[in-house]
Amino acid sequence: MKKHFPLTSTRLLAATTAFAAAALVAACGGGGGSSTGSGTPPVDPAGAPVTIFDRTTAPSKLSAWHFVLSDGAKLTLNDGVVPYDLNTALFSDYAFKLRALYVPAGKQIGYKTDGTLDFPIGSAIMKTFYYPTATGTDAAYTGVARANQTVQGSSIDLSAYRLIETRVLVRQPDGTWTGLPYVWDADQKDATLKIGGASVALELVGGGGANEKFAYGVPNAQTCEKCHSTETSGGAGILPIGPKARNMNKSYAYDAATTKNQLVALDDLKLLSGFTGIATAPVNADWRDTTQTLEARAKAYLDSNCAHCHNPGGNASQSGLMLDYATVGTTTTPSKWGVCKKPLAYGGPGAPYRYGIEPGQADVSLLLYRMQHTATADVMPAVGRHVNHTEANAMIGDWINSLTLAACL
């Protein structure tokens, strides 16, 4: 079974007019224009509308959905597919990500100040993973550049970037979500469904570190559920992780001349219901923004990279370690976020590593230790990371060293 929804070019045209008339807002986290492309997402040249499939009829090719179009030289979003970004995102081996959402005509996303926004039936969220191209040292590995993403926009220039995969989350008629991974073909013109996941040999080049070869992992359905079953009371289904008000309350450079707060943009597009304005909207820090406090940056990073499992309804709830935004930094029960907390199951390297966080002692804190290692027994997050996020680890270390809570006994 599949459903066709009409193109929504009139909504985007109206939004573009509104964008041009509005005062530009400075982009959070250094978006500063679009290096990946420009302009309002174009209509698919074939005139094909976005097509939503149910879980039993998912197509083998990404192009069948008409979310994106690639001619091998440039990837663009179809009409009605809206790009977005997050203040602080999940680290995925330095991959860049073009996030986008689609809402059926006449439907709206329910605004919430806490938790994932409420997407209507027939909605889709897609995330394309890609890297800046680079010259590696081994023909068996694709060379890609090590960098932290700053580019935004509505398209990807494939002369400068290499597509790896696109993940699609679709809200089904029964209200549940289905996740599907598509791996981009060698010619970069389409992507193929890989239900069982896949491995892509990559070599990170430059960025202040030694070249690093690794197997980039495209998740299978079971792996997807490990993270996306968060906040569902025991994994009774999966949910999107990123699209929360506090993550999306930031500016986005839709093209070189148009930058606007994303929540306001969705509201202007008539895609958001119940929105009360950015003055009352929660906001996460950008972990890279050194004008923010270390605590705000650390809370945002742990919330985006750890809390999908380390929350009361997540897969790591049994650990007793809660790393969600509301919990980290509280002084009433700091053990909940790891302070002087011994691990329940993780054996670890032994002394002097005793606690998740030892205030003022990042070098012996297990939280940072696990973020600095990639061995299966040690790595955290347990899914989606094969290399270390050196810059973020340094920030987390600085935060732990800044803590002035009582020393652990």
Kindly give the residue locations of the regions a language model identified:
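Extended surface/linker regions that mediate inter-domain or inter-protein docking
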Residues: 87-92, 96-300
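N-terminal pre-domain segments of enzymes
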Residues: 37-100
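The −1 position to Zn-ligating cysteines in a subset of zinc-ribbon hairpins
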Residues: 223, 305, 379
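Electron-transfer interface patches adjacent to heme c in soluble/periplasmic c-type cytochromes
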Residues: 250-299, 308-314, 320-409
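Bacterial Sec-dependent N-terminal signal peptides
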Residues: 22-51, 409
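Secreted/processed peptides and extracellular or luminal domains of membrane proteins
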Residues: 34, 230-233, 312-315, 346
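Bacterial N-terminal signal peptides that target proteins for export
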Residues: 2-17
